[in-house]
Each structure stands twice: as C-alpha cells, then as structure tokens.
C-alpha cells in the first residue's frame, strides 16, 4: 500500500518544525494523517477565462474537507493570448506553458502533496497543468472555468453570433463602419469564460474529458451557468475517491498515467479531429505524451486523421455554432458517443467519472441515455446578460439537440465531411510535418498552388498584408517564428484575420513555423518542422518560389530541384554564426526568452525542452 507523500512532512519528531508551520496554515491535531490535496488555481484579473475563478478553489476545498481531506490552494500564472496577440507579448505565451508546468511541480513536490486538483481554463494553462499532472503522476482531476457565452448583436436587422475573431476582422476591415466595428467589439465577448468557439482553450478542456481526467460537461458547460458549480463540488469529491483508491487500496488505475495511457491519447486526438479542434492541441498533446512517457507522435496523428470524420463543426469554422450549442447537443460525451458507435474509440479506457469510458458514455451520451437529470444538465444555456460572475444564471434551452443528421453533432453517416478537422502534411518544406486545421479550409482550397511571399517575422507579414504587398495567389511564408526562432512560437491570428479583412481569406495560403490561434480559419498551415532556426527548409524559401499544397495527398512541396535546394543549404551554412537567423529583423529578446529558446524543440516534438542537453 503506497504511503501518503505528505507523511514526509507531517510524521516523526524531526518534523516538529514542519508541523508547526502546517498548524499555522489552519491544520488541526486531528487533521494530521489525512491526505493533503493541492488545488492549483489559475485565477487572474487579466484574463476573462479566469476572472471568475477567485472563489473556485475554496469551493473545491470545502468538498475535499467534507470528504475527509486537507485542501491547500496555490496559484499559477495565466497569459491571455488574445490580449498578448499582435505585439511582443505573444512571445511569452507558449513559454508560459513550461513555467506553469514547473510551478505546479515545484509547489506539489516542495510541500509533499498527495493529490492534485487543477482549476484551469485558457490556452496554455490547461496544457501546462496537464504536463505537470502527468509528470507528477499522483491522483489528479481537472475542472475548468468553462466557456464564455457567444456574443450576439443585430447588424442590418439580422441577429448574428460573434466571438473575438469577428472583432479582430471587423477592426481591420475598412469596409466596416466605425459604428459597426464598435458594436461588434462591444458584443463579441459578453461574459467571463474562455472564448466561445472551438478555440485552443475550449479544445483542450474538451480533450481532458476524452483523456479521462475531467468530468462530463467540463469542456462545454458555460462559465455563467449555475450547473457548473456542481462540477467544482464533484471534482472535490472525486479527487478524494481517487486518492483513497490509490493510497488505501493500492489501485493503480487511479493514477493519471494509467488513465491517460496510449489508448486515451488516441481517444483525445480522435475527438480533436472529429470536432475540428485548434491545431495547438497537437502541440500540447505531444508535449503531454512526453511527460506521460507515452510513445504518441505525429505519425499517430497522421494515421488517425485519415480515419476520423468531421462530426462537429463549431466557430471559427462556422458562424452557426458555438460552445453553448455543443453543450446543448450533448457536449464532448455526445461526440464521443458517435465516435464509439463508429468503432473509433477505445471505450475500455479508464475515466475519473466511472470505471471506464463505456460506462461514462452509457450515462452521459444523450443519444443513448434516458437519464432525465443528464438531459437537464445538457439543456443548460446562455442568458445573454454581460457578466464576469460564475454561476450567475440558470437559463435552459427548451430541448436538447439530438438531431444527428443536420444538428451541431452528426453521426458518421451524416458527417460534415468524411475527412477529419485536422491533417498532417509533409514534404520538402516540412520534413518532420506540419499541421492544417482542415475544418476551417474551404473545399476549393484543399489543393493550392501559389507564389511564395516570404517574411522574416509576423510583424513584417502584417505590414505586408495591410500595405497591399500580398495579392491573390500568394503563399505567405512567415518564418523564424518557431519555438527557438521566435522565440516562443507566436500565434498568427492577426495575419490570417487581416487576410480575411482584405478579401484574401480564400485566395491566399499562409505557412509558418509559428502556430495559429484556435480562432484561425482559412488555408493556414503551421508548426512547420524543423523550424527555420533549427535548419528547416522553410528558411531556404525565396519570394517567388512555387509552393504546392495538396491536403488530400497530405503533401506540401517547395517546387525547386533537389540540386537547387542543396545549393541554398550550402550557401546558408557558409554564413557561419549568422546561419539560420532572420535577416534584418530587430527584436528585443529578454533573458527569460533566451533561456527558453536554448532548450526548445520544434513543434513536431511538442515544443518541449530538449532534455538531452541537460546531461
């Protein structure tokens, strides 16, 4: 039977000083010997997805203490990618993932916590905490802050749904009046919660359900809805159950590495492809797999992308559906249920909500469940009232959406497409692969041949797009924005938004060793590996080169001869210390970012640290 980790700091005469300090935090005599549960909360007033989390840790703590544990809360940082977008702040977003993972490890190991509750929500916070949880391998459960309600407003007497991306596009579109742009801005992000589409934050929170590490509804129940309160309370109760199973009963299935095993990672990626999730999820799943010591790679993602249909289409891939609509249609469990019936899931995978995924689906998949409480749970809807408060409303849809032919979630037979929402491309431009979110690409753009327009930074690309340099038929190439070359692998939401605002969204392509926001749509190909700074071919592309993109064939090609490509590589290497560096780019890089870049790997490895350099 495993011994409580916390006994290290609570048992024995030589721990008198530590016990004295525990007492100073409120621990009583009869508390010693109980499991200590760490609560990692990411509350901050900087981020709408986290602004409502201040009291959530203590809500969970109360449930833990009622169930016989000791709860101790600490905080991590959280970067808002939308606010950091379009300027030097974006350099810090991806590196913050590693800091979050490390900070959770530091706090949990320094204080010998026995188990962990992760209260996360936005883009890098859920992945960072996931990496830490799998690194630590102690009982864990995730509970997120939940998605924002979709924005709604009337334009030209028509009620439309909105999100952050609509505000960005309208702000850069000269055809949109100042009044309309301001109206869109004021309506786009009406409540607390993670941005309302299938962007990175919501994608990752959905994937924790598929990995088996969070409760049903975690990824889709609105932040504002009163029903979400029960998810936090149940998370507190469940972590105590997991803790008891492991430490008292020696039940190894309660540990995250045994829940999030290879089959669970396949389930998560299958869900991601089926729902057209953010391409960033590829980066984060690869990183999490490394922490879990699971051999899950780009090859596995490529294989799955050829098998899994696109069953759920959500903003930014369509203006019709947002996360509130996904929840009404049964949430993640609704999508997983259809995947299970299509024979595409490992339904024997362990899950924190039941003995295995099959058991959880039997109860929570509204297409098969007759449980009235479950149907009521998924009827939770938006109130349409701007607020920063959690649990502030109890509105419900008149009915849940079980239309699997023309609804938000479809069966395999009636899928939005038989090709999934993400694809891995490879070729001489990306020898180790790159990612495209096919869910956001028009069918006519699935094959594209164009002329390269090369930029050494996102800033230069934005200036080129807004200045009219980029024209129909161009393939915009943005390089030296990878994990090492940026450093920090910036998101390219502004370049893609500005292409849309200039009417070029379906008339140009964009490829980069950087990455894209989950809000990106259009022929946007990111994560090109190896990156330019690591000697990748993308560094050898010249303006005017022909680039051929073929999504059905999963290929991307720089159309020059092998002889010419080799000559360019030789010329680059001859530059010595100036080789594989951007030409003419002026960028202030802090010591913190330089330290990150020193160990950063390319995107095909999850942009994690290259631990081989640590000895």
UniProtKB/Swiss-Prot annotation:
Where [2Fe-2S] cluster binds, per the record, is at 122, 195
Q: Name one GO cellular component term.
A: cytosol
| Gene Ontology process terms (BP) | isoleucine biosynthetic process; L-valine biosynthetic process
What's a Pfam family this protein contains? ILVD_EDD_N
Keyword Lyase in the entry? The reply is yes
Q: Which residues bind Mg(2+)?
A: 81, 123-124, 491
Which co-factor is required?
[2Fe-2S] cluster; Mg(2+)
Top-level class of the enzyme under EC nomenclature? lyase
Record's superkingdom?
Bacteria
The record's InterPro entries line, in alphabetical order, gives: Dihydro-acid_dehy_C, DihydroxyA_deHydtase, DiOHA_6PGluconate_deHydtase_CS, ILV_EDD_C, ILV_EDD_N, IlvD/EDD_N
Q: In which pathway does it act?
A: Amino-acid biosynthesis; L-isoleucine biosynthesis; L-isoleucine from 2-oxobutanoate: step 3/4; Amino-acid biosynthesis; L-valine biosynthesis; L-valine from pyruvate: step 3/4
The record's cofactor note says: Binds 1 [2Fe-2S] cluster per subunit. This cluster acts as a Lewis acid cofactor.
N6-carboxylysine modifications at:
124
- Does the entry feature the keyword RNA-binding, yes or no? no
Q: How does it assemble?
A: Homodimer.
The entry's family comment says: Belongs to the IlvD/Edd family.
Could you tell me which NCBIfam families the record lists for this protein? ilvD (TIGR00110), PRK12448.1 (NF009103)
Its name, as the record gives it, is: Dihydroxy-acid dehydratase
Tell me what organism the protein belongs to: Shewanella piezotolerans (strain WP3 / JCM 13877)
- Tell me the lineage of the source organism: Bacteria, Pseudomonadati, Pseudomonadota, Gammaproteobacteria, Alteromonadales
């Amino acid at each position: 039977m495993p011994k409580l980790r916390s006994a290290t700091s609570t048992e024995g005469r030589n721990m008198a000083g530590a016990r004295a300090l525990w007492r100073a935090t409120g621990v009583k005599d009869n508390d010693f010997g109980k499991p200590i549960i760490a609560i990692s909360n990411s509350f901050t007033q900087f981020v709408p997805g986290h602004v409502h989390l201040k009291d959530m840790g203590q809500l969970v703590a109360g449930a833990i203490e009622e169930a016989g544990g000791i709860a101790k809360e600490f905080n991590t940082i959280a970067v808002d990618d939308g606010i950091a977008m379009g300027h030097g702040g974006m350099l810090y977003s991806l590196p913050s993932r590693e800091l979050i993972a490390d900070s959770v490890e530091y706090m949990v190991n320094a204080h010998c916590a026995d188990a962990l509750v992760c209260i996360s929500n936005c883009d890098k916070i859920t992945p960072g905490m996931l990496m830490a949880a799998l690194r630590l391998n102690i009982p864990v459960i995730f509970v997120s802050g939940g998605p924002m309600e979709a924005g709604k407003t009337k334009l030209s007497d028509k009620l439309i749904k909105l999100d952050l991306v609509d505000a960005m596009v309208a702000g850069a579109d000269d055809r949109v009046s100042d009044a309309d742009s301001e109206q869109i801005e004021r309506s786009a992000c009406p409540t607390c919660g993670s941005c309302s589409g299938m962007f990175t934050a919501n994608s990752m929170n959905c994937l924790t359900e598929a990995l088996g590490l969070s409760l049903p509804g975690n990824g889709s129940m609105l932040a504002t809805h009163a029903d979400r309160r029960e998810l936090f309370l149940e998370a507190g109760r469940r972590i105590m159950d997991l803790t008891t199973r492991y430490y008292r009963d020696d039940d190894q299935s309660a540990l995250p590495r045994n829940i999030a095993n290879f089959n669970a990672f396949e389930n998560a990626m299958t869900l991601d492809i089926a729902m057209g999730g953010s391409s960033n999820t590829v980066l984060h799943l690869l990183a999490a797999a490394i922490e879990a010591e699971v051999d899950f790679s780009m090859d596995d993602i490529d294989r799955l992308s050829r098998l899994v249909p696109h069953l759920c289409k959500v903003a930014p891939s369509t203006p019709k559906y947002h996360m509130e609509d996904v929840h009404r249609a049964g949430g993640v469990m609704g999508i997983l249920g259809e995947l299970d019936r299509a024979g595409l899931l490992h339904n024997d995978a362990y899950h924190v909500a039941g003995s295995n995924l099959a058991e959880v689906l039997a109860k929570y998949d509204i297409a098969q469940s007759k449980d009235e409480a479950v149907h009521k749970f998924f009827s939770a809807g938006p109130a349409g009232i701007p607020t920063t408060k959690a649990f502030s409303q109890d509105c419900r849809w008149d009915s849940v959406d079980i239309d699997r032919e023309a609804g938000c979630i479809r069966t395999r037979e009636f899928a939005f497409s038989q090709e999934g929402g993400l694809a891995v491309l490879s070729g001489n431009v990306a020898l180790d692969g790159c990612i495209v979110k096919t869910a956001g690409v028009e069918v006519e753009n699935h094959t594209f041949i164009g002329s390269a327009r090369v930029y050494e930074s996102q800033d230069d690309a934005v200036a080129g797009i807004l200045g009219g340099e980029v024209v129909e038929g161009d393939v915009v190439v943005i390089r030296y924005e990878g994990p090492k070359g940026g450093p920090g692998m910036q998101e390219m939401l502004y370049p893609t938004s500005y292409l849309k605002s200039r009417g070029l969204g379906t008339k140009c392509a964009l490829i980069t060793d950087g990455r894209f926001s989950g809000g990106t749509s259009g022929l946007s190909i990111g994560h090109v590996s190896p990156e330019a700074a690591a000697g990748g071919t993308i560094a050898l592309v010249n303006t005017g080169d022909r680039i051929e993109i073929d999504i059905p064939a999963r290929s991307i090609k720089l159309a020059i001869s092998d002889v010419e490509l080799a000559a360019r590589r030789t010329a680059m290497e001859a530059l010595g210390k100036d080789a594989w560096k951007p030409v003419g780019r002026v960028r202030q890089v802090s010591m913190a970012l330089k330290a990150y870049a020193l160990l950063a790997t390319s995107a095909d490895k999850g942009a994690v640290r290259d631990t081989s350099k640590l000895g």
